[in-house]
């Protein structure tokens, strides 16, 4: 069962845990992956989960449904993505980690894309689509960028769009019935 946003949800920063949190109810708090040093100043005051957040929640839940993730993991992904969209500090592109692809794509917010490094391939969710570069959330466990640098799952990176390729769509498997 998927949780549904409501008027009582509140974003707040927890200094003790150094994390942006989302109060879902009196008994449930979601801890994002993001620390204070990664956040814009407005994240340090309590903010409501607004109508735009709710719209993005439903948009992204529809997009990530094609991932082979459990619903709780999809919700975790989407809430982290909304936190990035709303509270993450602006980033400069770090495209050099990834190889160029041809033809270049122009992704949209919520698109699932792939990017390759010399050490492997990763899947990403586009959080903010730009004309030249987009902010992406890593969906791969500890993607190796270089011999000394990894990008953790839910890590955020801005990349030029010519590094992205569409995520292959899984083909339905049918068995022949006689």
Curated annotation (Swiss-Prot):
Keywords: Cell cycle, Cell division, Cytoplasm, Septation
Family named by the database record: Belongs to the ZapC family.
Claim: Methyltransferase is one of the keywords in the record: no
Principal cellular location given in the protein's record: cytoplasm
Record's protein name: Cell division protein ZapC
GO CC annotations, alphabetized: cytoplasm
Subcellular localization: Cytoplasm
HAMAP family per the UniProt record, alphabetical: ZapC
Pfam hit, one: ZapC_C
Domain of life: Bacteria
Spans traversing the lipid bilayer: none
Organism name: Aeromonas hydrophila subsp. hydrophila (strain ATCC 7966 / DSM 30187 / BCRC 13018 / CCUG 14551 / JCM 1027 / KCTC 2358 / NCIMB 9240 / NCTC 8049)
């Amino acid at each position: 069962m998927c949780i549904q946003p409501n008027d009582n949800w509140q974003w707040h920063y927890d200094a003790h845990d150094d994390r942006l949190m989302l109060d879902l109810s009196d008994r449930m708090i979601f801890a994002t992956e993001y620390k204070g040093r990664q956040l814009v100043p407005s994240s340090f005051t309590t903010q409501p989960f607004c109508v735009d957040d709710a719209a993005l929640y439903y948009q992204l839940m529809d997009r990530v449904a094609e991932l082979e993730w459990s619903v709780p993991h999809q919700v975790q992904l989407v809430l982290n993505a909304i936190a990035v969209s709303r509270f993450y500090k602006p980033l400069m592109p770090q495209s050099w980690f990834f190889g160029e692809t041809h033809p270049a794509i122009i992704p949209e917010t919520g698109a699932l894309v792939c990017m390759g490094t010399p050490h492997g391939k990763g899947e990403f969710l586009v959080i903010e689509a730009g004309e030249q570069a987009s902010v992406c959330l890593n969906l791969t466990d500890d993607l190796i960028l270089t011999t000394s640098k990894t990008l953790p799952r839910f890590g955020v990176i801005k990349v030029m769009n010519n590094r992205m390729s569409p995520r292959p769509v899984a083909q339905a498997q049918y068995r022949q019935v006689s």
